[in-house]
């Protein structure tokens, strides 16, 4: 059992590194204007995470459109706004498919 656990930990670490490399490549290609290639890198990263049954890293998860799968670069193909109507939140709008993602802002406790 110990051997299997060590193998799983090692393979998950390798998967995290690969996802990180793929997302960095997706960001680079997105900035260069090659959107199809960046979508491909995002899809590969998601497949690796699903195969290893691990959650997608939060810092990358928020940079991907849930509807069309494109890598979001704020100001280029995504719009970011803060709203405080009912509850304070950040609204990220994908400018390719017009889907909206809302992320709540937690208020500081005094």
UniProtKB/Swiss-Prot annotation:
Zn(2+) binds at residues 65, 68, 94, 97. Coiled coil: none annotated. Keywords: Cytoplasm, Endonuclease, Hydrolase, Metal-binding, Nuclease, tRNA processing, Zinc. Its cofactor is Zn(2+). It catalyses: Endonucleolytic cleavage of RNA, removing 5'-extranucleotides from tRNA precursor. GO terms for molecular function: ribonuclease P activity; zinc ion binding. It is an enzyme of class 3 (hydrolase). GO terms for biological process: tRNA 5'-leader removal. InterPro entries: RNP4, Rpr2/Snm1/Rpp21. It is found in: Cytoplasm. Its EC number is 3.1.26.5. One of its GO terms (cellular component) is cytoplasm. It comes from the Archaea. Part of ribonuclease P, a protein complex that generates mature tRNA molecules by cleaving their 5'-ends. This is Ribonuclease P protein component 4.
